């Protein structure tokens, strides 16, 4: 079996640390994989940080940033990266409360949530 054939069920790729360049993009394309990344501005990707880090963002500050951005320019089409596995030192896991609050708030505002494959047109 060719490696390329095994990617049919996972055609989307978020590179480690969300870092990629032309070489990574070309590699992915040659394998039939689409590189995707989060939309900057919401700070949702900072949910991995721990209190000892210089760039630490609490779950409340992440939630507040998302809501502030929504109020300022809307979130239609935004891709948010939320980590479902974070270090034990991060005791305020975004997914243990603020994620549900965010989803409910955005649904009340008329937003819908779309599977990633559909959102990026990769069905």
Please tell me what each predicted stretch does:
Residues 4-81, 85-107, 111-112, 117-121:
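Catalytic domains of cell-wall/extracellular-matrix polysaccharide-remodeling enzymes
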